[in-house]
């Protein structure tokens, strides 16, 4: 009678015979690593063995996080061990969130608040501030700037005929080296407005004396208070000096105010 041959089965068949189903999940910790072994069926209805390896690290967390980890589990996970369960929890990477105030976001997108696009520019030192707030106001730098502007305006008035444009008679006379029929040009008068109430004749003279010689000046004052009414008239001996004064002083900051300078209009207009 032939003997019965012993047929060796696979480890999966042996596990099925021993346990009558899937074996339980096991965990072992060695050399700072945690090994989790579990068994499950794949899509072909075959038993598979899955081994997950975790590296154990220690880190400092906020008190609220540490307290939350001590909470008791509930439901189907009531009997689970501390820490995440691979059956119900998927551990992903930490996501860092940054909360931004909406007002700060609006300010960041405001082009007017961009420091690289500063709209203020000083006429004296070319700094990023208004001319009225310039620390060099009234110093030698301010004086040199006014003198350069006066020379540039006078030079532009002399070079005007080269452009082919209309040349007033008074400029033609000045180019010829004379003042014309009259000894002076009475039309070289300007009106300076937006002056402060504390303005005096001495201040007015100090303001325009570096530009060119004047024939007369008039500072409008209130009859009752004697304070400046906010405007004044200055008559220069030459019209080119008056043009230079308009170019220099119009928009110039003086006594915390921005001056407005224009040609004086005749009284009959």
UniProtKB/Swiss-Prot annotation:
Pfam families reported in the protein's UniProt record: eIF3g, RRM_1
GO cellular component: eukaryotic 43S preinitiation complex; eukaryotic 48S preinitiation complex; eukaryotic translation initiation factor 3 complex
Family: Belongs to the eIF-3 subunit G family.
Superkingdom of origin: Eukaryota
InterPro entries, sorted: eIF3_g, eIF3g_N, eIF3G_RRM, Nucleotide-bd_a/b_plait_sf, RBD_domain_sf, RRM_dom
Stated name of the protein: Eukaryotic translation initiation factor 3 subunit G-1
Main location: cytoplasm
General function of this protein: RNA-binding component of the eukaryotic translation initiation factor 3 (eIF-3) complex, which is involved in protein synthesis of a specialized repertoire of mRNAs and, together with other initiation factors, stimulates binding of mRNA and methionyl-tRNAi to the 40S ribosome. The eIF-3 complex specifically targets and initiates translation of a subset of mRNAs involved in cell proliferation. This subunit can bind 18S rRNA.
Signal sequence interval, chain numbering: none
Residues annotated as domain RRM: 188-266
Compartments where located: Cytoplasm
Assembly description: Component of the eukaryotic translation initiation factor 3 (eIF-3) complex. The eIF-3 complex interacts with pix.
